[in-house]
Every structure is written in C-alpha cells, then in structure tokens.
From Swiss-Prot:
PANTHER family xref list: SULFATE TRANSPORTER
InterPro entries found in the cross-reference section: SLC26A/SulP_dom, SLC26A/SulP_fam, STAS_dom, STAS_dom_sf
All copies of domain STAS, residue ranges: 406-541
GO cellular component: plasma membrane
A Pfam family of this chain: Sulfate_transp
Taxonomy of the source species: Eukaryota, Metazoa, Chordata, Craniata, Vertebrata
Protein name per Swiss-Prot or TrEMBL: Putative solute carrier family 26 member 10P
Membrane association type: Multi-pass membrane protein
Amino acid sequence: MRLDLASLMSAPKSLGSAFKSWRLDKAPSPQHTFPSTSIPGMAFALLASVPPVFGLYTSFFPVLIYSLLGTGRHLSTGTFAILSLMTGSAVERLVPEPLVGNLSGIEKEQLDAQRVGVAAAVAFGSGALMLGMFVLQLGVLSTFLSEPVVKALTSGAALHVLLSQLPSLLGLSLPRQIGCFSLFKTLASLLTALPRSSPAELTISALSLALLVPVKELNVRFRDRLPTPIPGEVVLVLLASVLCFTSSVDTRYQVQIVGLLPGGFPQPLLPNLAELPRILADSLPIALVSFAVSASLASIHADKYSYTIDSNQEFLAHGASNLISSLFSCFPNSATLATTNLLVDAGGKTQLAGLFSCTVVLSVLLWLGPFFYYLPKAVLACINISSMRQVFCQMQELPQLWHISRVDFLLQVPGLCILSYPTPLYFGTRGQFRCNLEWHLGLGEGEKETSKPDGPMVAVAEPVRVVVLDFSGVTFADAAGAREVVQVRERLASRCRDARIRLLLAQCNALVQGTLTRVGLLDRVTPDQLFVSVQDAAAYALGSLLRGSSTRSGSQEALGCGK
C-alpha cells in the first residue's frame, strides 16, 4: 500500500511556518513545563516499575518525534499514568520482584536492567503495531471512539492507579498483583498490611496531599484571575527534598528516596527482540489505548480551535514515537490530558510548545538531576494521584450519562456485555455465530485465557455475568441458522449455569422471531428474557447485577439454560 509521503514532508514545513505565527511572549514558562513534564515523568516511571530517570527519557524523546510527525497542534505527548500502569503489569509479570528480601546493589542494578529491557520491548512492540496500522490505513478506527467509551476506560484505570500508589503512600513494600481481580487482591493485601505502615512516609504523604489538592482546586477555580497557575508540584518537590536532606529521614526512618539520577542520555540499544512473543499480548492493548486516548484528545482540541487532524498520520506519529524512543530505553507513551491542558493554558498554540518543554527536561537530565536525590518516593506517589484529579472528577458525570443514554452508562458497568451480531443468521454464518458467542462468554477451553476466533490467545479481563444479544442487525434467519441458536443453547446450558451467565435477547424483528418460534427456541424461554430494545435489556441487566440476581440464579432462566 502506498504511504502518504506528502504528509511526512509537510511536518517540517508546518514547524517552519509556526515560527512566524507563534509569538514568543506566549511561550510556556518553565514553571508550567517543569511540573507538567519532569516531575510526572519520574512519578509515572514508578508505575511502570522502572527507575525514575527513565520517566525523564520518556518525557524527552517521544516529544521530539511527535513534534515532527504529529498533526495535533495542541497535543502534548509523554508519560501517561494508565499506559505506565499497563506497562508495569507486564514488567511485574515477566520480571517479578524476588522474595529473598533486600537486594544488594549489583542485584538491584541487574533487576532494574531487566525491567527496563522489558518496558522498552513493550514500547517497541506497541510502536511496531501502530506503524502496521498506519500502513493498513486503520485511522478510521478513531470514528468508533465515542466519549463514553474513552471515559469508561480512563475511569476504570484511574482506580487501578489509585490503589497501586497506596503502598508507596503508606510506606509498605507489597508485591504488585496482576491478572484477573488484581484490583481486589491489591486492596486485600493493603488492608492486611495496614498495621505495618510507616509513620514517617504516612506523614509525608498526608502533608503532600494537603498541599497539592488545595493548590489544584485554586488553580481550577481561579484560572481566569490567576496570571499563571500556582506551581504546587515545584513547591512540594523543593520542600520535600530540603526536609529529607536536613533531617536525614531516609536513614533514620527508612524513607524511600529517588536516589541518584544519572546525567546525560542512555546509549541507544535495540530492545531484546526475543521478548516480543511474550509481550505481544501486552503491546496490542497498550497500542490501542495509546491511540484511543491520543486521537480523542487531539479531536477535542481540533474541534475547539477549528482545524483537522489526520488519524492515519497520528498512527504514524505515535508509532514512531514509541518505536524510536524504545531504542533509548523509554517505556510506552501517548498524549497526556493534564500536560496538554497545562500547555494550552500557558499559551501554547503549536508543537513548538512541546519542543520548549523538551529544553526543560534536557536541563534536568544534564544539570538538575542531583537535586532530586533526596526526593521521597511517597511525594511522587502523591503527584501521581493528584494528576488523576480530572479523571476522578469525570465520574461525577455518570448520573448525567445515565439520564442521557443508559446504554452509554452501562459501558462502564463491569459484568455486562452487549453482543451485536450484524449479519444474517444462515447456514454460512452459523459457525461464526457459535464461536463468537463462546468467546465473548469466556466459555472456551482453559480457565485463565481463551482463544478469539482466528486470533491469538488473550486474557479474559472481567467475568461476564449478563450478555445481551443484540439481534437488530440480523435481517433474516434460515432454518439452519435458527437451529444453530437452539443447539448453542443446548450445548452451552451447563457451562452457562456453572459460570452463572445470563443471556438476554433484544430487538429481534418479526421475521426472525417467527423463524426462531418455528424451530422451538421461544417455547423454552419466558417473556422476561425478550426485549423490544437493547436499552430495555441493558436496564434490566443492570438491575439484575445490582440486586445480585445473576449470582443467585445464574443462567437458569436465560434463554432456557436452566431447563
């Protein structure tokens, strides 16, 4: 397929014209760029389970690359909490923390080197996948990224980020939980170890949040009156570093600190390609999440400032950012909501704002690194949590979303799956119908993972309790297709009952309903399993989940599975 070379060559030209249209008096000041890039970069590196300095690398190289290739004028790239958390899960799974206790200096360096290698391999894999999507011109996928879907993703991930940072806030050394129900496993281990919390780190965390939260509220409430936002992160870092240095809390109370940040840049190194098969299952969702967040954020600002973005070019820009930066030991990156808003508020109008922020990160890498030696890691955890403020605030929109569109609201309810079958159900598609249904129900072979039809092995993230079969796209069904529905019901009856899954049928037209009636399916179900619209079925399913009826009755009534 022919690549769009014109879009590649137009990026330097757009940067050149930006010098004429961008006024220097609107350049973002260091007090904006320093707290929005350097400090969160080090904080998000802890989420990715790599040393803090690699967060600075990830705040530098991807910004340079995206500035040359991206089409989002107001977009700021770099470290992102959700991607860092997903990367950290892969790193912890492939290079777990040893159970032998304290490690020696050499052992710690070897462990960090292995973890950095895995994180860089994940970035390389996700970048390669996005470049492949650019070649296939899959930018049309951005049209399916509705606002409720993106908010559902970020809201759920924000809860994972919050719980993952609580051990650092409390001074607890707990292994990171991975796999299904990791959120609840982390919460259980946290509550169990709560009596062992460090009073010193707990005090540092409380004071840090007491400073950060009010400052961020003041910046939001008085953003029109303040000439510049209050740099709460900068003040906090300076105060915490000075306090830790003068009182020696790191040695007296065993408070964990950032330590030495190596100066300069890492040597370019190709990630271990042997790790790619092991991290493919992690690279694909990271690539999709990276594009989803970046494309939606770019579209918001493009609509606000009346210009257009090229979705395929965004695949190229973010793919190149991840792939090339992985050669410098960077972990996966994408556009960031907080940094983008800060740079826009500071007057940034083009990607030159991102290049300006690179100079601030460069100064930290070359000269200012030693000043962060005594910075407590608990402070970075507090910055992580406070940076997700906007994501937590968007949960307040759930009641409004419920009144506007209950189906969009239910996108954020775990345990519910709405499965739409958009083709006629006849002898040629009945096998595909059965495979798709079994895969979405998680009833394939194996306990922990299942194989998607014509696809790789993927993990089942959330257990499905209620499935709504949307038959609005089934225009007709022949005898073979209708009998397949009956056979699927008989074949899955026991497994649905054991897995406690309920199946509901919605929006079936009169022709298809008549065919299903003639083959005997509708004689085996009660009217409360049939719904006129998907919205009615979803509302009924939500009530069942809230009442716990799916746990009590399983699937004994769903499509006659219990008969």
